[in-house]
């Protein structure tokens, strides 16, 4: 979704970014959203111009974002504040995972399938339970979300460890601020209201940066904030021209849509497409 769509949001969470100063042109859409009555929350270790503009600045200990977002997920699940119809219709939450799967709470911090020799996971136990051929869905689903091996229930068990108390101890965030953030997201993630999540390098430049982004994506999917006006996740990059260069793009090695340039060894369209598939 384009940055302009932020103007349609009812709540905007900016985490790990001083958007007001690093993306001054794009920030105009945050200003427009606030004029409409949107709530702006800035989560960042520093107090910056973005913090001054926000309705609330929540200081966080650097590198602990995954704990904060994990606790918000747990809060939404525990209090039935997720967008049920959206989750059932548009996510893999109802799908059933193999009985062989074990989570980190079962294996002392590791998922099933870990190979200590290679340091990688063999993901056979992570697969969906398949339905017989000819069924309307090719995998088993439980739209009540109550099956113990559904993705939804696995998610609930995994994030149960993240509590407001853990957030306070790990992130240095007062419980009052945590509840303000969680309630703001919940109240503005309904059939007629949306929340937008924006991040930049303060969020990603960590050894766990990819996990931070995954957690934000899980949060936005649980609340129905993907594919609707004023929703989504905005990856702001470090400063304005980098985002534009990759989106348009003006970089020498990529085509619009983040497609790689053809190479000399790809002499036909099928070879080019197959090369993209193999690289991804």
Where are each of the predicted segments found?
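Generic, well-ordered alpha-helical scaffold segments in large soluble proteins
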Residues: 15, 29, 33-36, 71, ...
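Short secondary-structure boundary/capping segments
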Residues: 28-30, 56-60, 73-76, 211-216, ...
């Amino acid at each position: 979704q384009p940055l302009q769509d932020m103007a349609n949001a009812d709540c905007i969470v900016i985490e790990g970014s001083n958007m007001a100063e690093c993306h001054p042109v794009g920030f105009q859409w945050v200003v427009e959203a606030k004029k409409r009555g949107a709530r702006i929350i800035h989560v960042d270790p520093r107090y910056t111009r973005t913090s001054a503009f926000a309705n609330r600045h929540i200081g966080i200990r650097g590198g602990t974002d995954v704990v904060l977002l994990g606790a918000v997920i747990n809060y939404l699940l525990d209090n039935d504040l997720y967008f049920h119809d959206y989750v059932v219709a548009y996510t893999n939450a109802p799908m059933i995972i193999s009985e062989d799967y074990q989570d980190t709470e079962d294996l002392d911090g590791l998922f099933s399938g870990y190979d200590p020799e290679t340091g990688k996971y063999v993901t056979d136990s992570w697969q969906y339970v398949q339905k017989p051929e000819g069924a309307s869905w090719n995998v088993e689903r439980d739209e009540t979300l109550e099956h113990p091996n559904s993705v939804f229930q696995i998610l609930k068990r995994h994030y149960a460890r993240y509590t407001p108390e853990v957030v306070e101890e790990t992130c240095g965030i007062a419980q009052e601020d945590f509840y303000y953030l969680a309630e703001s997201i919940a109240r503005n993630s309904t059939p007629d209201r949306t929340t937008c999540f924006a991040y930049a390098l303060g969020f990603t430049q960590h050894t766990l940066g990819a996990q931070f982004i995954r957690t934000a994506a899980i949060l936005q999917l649980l609340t129905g904030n993907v594919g609707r006006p004023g929703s989504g996740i905005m990856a702001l990059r470090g400063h304005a021209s980098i985002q534009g260069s990759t989106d348009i793009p003006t970089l020498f090695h990529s085509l619009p849509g983040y497609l790689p340039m053809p190479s000399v060894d790809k002499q036909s369209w099928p070879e080019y497409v197959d090369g993209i598939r193999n690289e991804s």
